[in-house]
Amino acid sequence: MIDHIEIRGARVHNLKNVDVDVPLHQIVAIAGLSGSGKSSLALGVLYAEGSRRYLEALSTYTRRRMTQAAKAQVDEVLYVPAALALHQRPGVPGMRSTFGTGTELLNSLRLLFSRLASHRCPNGHYLPPTLAVAAGQALTCPQCGATFYAPSAEELAFNSQGACRTCDGTGIVRTVDLSTLVPDDSLTIDEGAVAPWNSLMWSLMTDVCREMGVRTDVPFRELSDREKEIVFHGPAEKKHILYHSKKTEQATELDFTYYNAVYTVENALAKVKDEKGMKRVEKFLKQAPCPDCGGSRLSEAARAPKVRGLSLDEVCRMPLSELCEWVAGVPASLPEEMRPMAESICEAFAGVAKRLLDLGLGYLSLDRAASTLSTGERQRMQLARAVRNRTTGVLYVLDEPSIGLHPSNLVGLCGVMQDLVADGNSVVLVDHDTQVLEQSDWMIEMGPGAGADGGRVIAQGTPRELSKNPASKIGPFLFGENSAPMRPRAKQETLFSQGTIALSTSQLHTVKPLSAQFPKGRLTVVTGVSGSGKTTLVLESLVPALQDQIAGKPLPPHVKALDAPGIRQVKLIDATPIGINVRSTVATYANVHDELRKTFAKTADAKRLGYKAGDFSYNTGRLRCPTCDGTGEISLDVQFLPDVNIPCPQCRGARYAKEAAAVRYEAKNGQTYSLPDLMAMDVHDALSACADLKVVRQRLQVLEDLGLGYLTLGEETPRLSGGEAQRLKLASEMGKSQSDSQIGRAHV
């Protein structure tokens, strides 16, 4: 019996001809430093080959309609099962997705309310639950004799026939925010006081407004209430005006209809066709819960059926842990003949919900917008969705499943992985958390360093064996035998000596009113079990409140008070990937590339050849490679197969034309370098090459200090992991000079 996957000659990213056997039907953990090749082995080899080979078994017709992965750079991979990957950063769902739709728990609830509810007749009388609904028979009201059909599960869906007509099933309505229409009331209308008329409407609207009887040459604050009412809500009357064109200085007589400021925004919103157009309009809008459905997204008819005295929207507001108890009591509340059907529906609900409860998501309600969930919550939703079908013979590749998990929630995660193995599957996970690594059956450690210094298997065995292996770098930290060094903490008596940021909020989501104080000039950590309110406190309250206060806007509705003296900027540094543009590199994002271009433009070679700093841009400059247009690679369209990306045959991935090599920068140590030479170096080597360039050296040193010395300057940012992206964003901020305007910054 085959008991392992054989990998021979793996060369994905920085892997150096790796030969390794990965046990099947076990939990296998891949550990190592950031950039050591963990994800390259797990996702770039195991998942890529497992999924590709499964897809190749499908017909050509089917494969042409699917996104296919290219063959991994590996000599041989034997005995790899069909693979599923749970990525580190699941995509942020759209506005129509909720926790209930994402987990598909709402499907069971809609079926429950369709088949088992007390339904309301057209005259408002409720009928007791009956099997006639499941049989598709008409119902007759015993009180008024009205005949009607109970709603189907489809008619209870807010993304379909059950949607609220006012908000179209989104639960929110966009209305014009009057406070944004005149941001500076010291200006006159002629000077552009009415903002929508400047960006969304023709400039002649000020002339029409004047004909409506509004003074346009006095500050807006001095207008009468009647004049302001005309500006905001005036009637759409046609006026005869004399329009003076600013370009031709000619006057023209026109008949033009007056569009008040509010209607100008509403009209522009109705015509929005793309994201760019929406951005022009959204600054004049505010969101509020739909007044008709109260934010439930459901129509009045979809909210009518009741089970155990509650409607669908009411049970969707319950935390999942409470909802499970409520669902368990449904069969007993029904007539005897309906209980078998009720038990079947409730068992289906409970089976899916159990996985989510095991993963610590019992505090979430089904109506919670999926876009407001944290990364860890979305990843656990993804994990629960993948494991609920009880498949067998599948390879599950998990990329840092412990992200966002409190140590107390890790037991549930490990239990889910053990259940997968018990069902005959194999689990490969990439992680840094020693508590998760200790639960694995087998460990493979990559290293010894990162980037070019990594890509090798330095140790493998059981966690206990690695803890005693002198070649292992993570071994000493397993089973609590060692701990990472800690920085000295500020003393309690001086903790708030540099000032305080004070915040208080009302209830939001499942989080009760909060009050918190953050010391200025200190490193503050917000921690707690999943669902305790970390994201709500920081990302949904503190950050937007600071941004609004700095911009002079009203605080978010749920923020009661904010006291942040001296804070003039707030920077959010999260772990979301840095775009999808291959033209973005480590050098450009870390603000190094511009400095290098200026340096090379000052060289004698550049002056002799007539090159300016702009010519050294691989995106738009004269020296970019004409074959690949500065991307460093070209895409080959292969019929019936996935597109193949290969290094550009002319520049060999350097992004520059051969003429760029003729411009040399001479360091004080006598060495000369071209810009393509520097872009091919990793940060560690570039530090010594750029030792004479103060600004470049400082910014590269920050990257080195943050453990990113293994990245090459020309590395594409979309290829970076979430942790690497976060550290690069941090380096980008730390590399900026701390001028007076930057002292009042809050970094989150």
Task: Annotate the PLM regions.
Residues 1-745:
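Conserved phosphate-binding elements of NTP-dependent enzyme cores
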